[in-house]
Amino acid sequence: MTDSSQDLRVFMIGPMGSGKSTVGRILAGLLDCDFVDSDAEIEARCGADIPWIFDVEGETGFRRREAAVLSELAQRPKVVIATGGGAVVTEINRQLMSETGVVVYLEVSVEQQLKRTGSGEGRPLLAKGDREETLRKLMEEREPLYQGLADLIISASGGNARRVARQIQEQLAAQSLLPLVAD
């Protein structure tokens, strides 16, 4: 975990549909930081969308790209980074995030994920089979990783995105990870 607000990096982790990008973008505004969605960055660099990368390179190829992008993003000062839901499955990503920034886990129920992810279009891991079963399986596998990595755990199930972002900002300030800034 970083202790310098001059070098603040916030990594948003959590399952798909937890609000990492939406809350992260708002949080970046509150903290006067840049915002980057790692999946969008991967797509921009690759010139293809995530489902195509999964189809052509498989999850292993995608995770390799993800690790490279996260490694570069972790060198930027004052940035909020929304990671993909599976970024935590790779040991090197977990180590990178814990050593270079503050890790915020947005906790959300599978029921909320189902509502927020809609048909699952554009989400390769939901493309086949029963969506609820897949989400429950992913949660079972990843929840211990999210919990173990997180510096802050914030419920994103009921609140609106701005309220969740404000709660994160207040928790960061309470833990002396940044000054409390009025917006």
Locate each region found by the language model.
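Conserved lysine of the Walker
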Residues: K20
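P-loop (Walker A) phosphate-binding loop of NTP-binding proteins
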Residues: P15
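Hydrophobic positions on the alpha1 helix immediately C-terminal to the Walker A/P-loop
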Residues: V23
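Short glycine-rich anion-binding loops that position phosphate/pyrophosphate groups of nucleotides
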Residues: G85-A87, S109-E111, G159-N160
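Hydrophobic anchor at the beta1->P-loop junction of P-loop NTPases
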Residues: M12
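ATP-dependent small-molecule kinase phosphotransfer cores
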Residues: D37-S98, R123, R136, L145
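NTP-dependent small-molecule kinase module
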Residues: M1-S5, I26, L30, R76, ...
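A glycine- and Lys/Arg-enriched "phosphate-lid" helix/loop adjacent to the NTP-binding pocket
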Residues: E99-P144
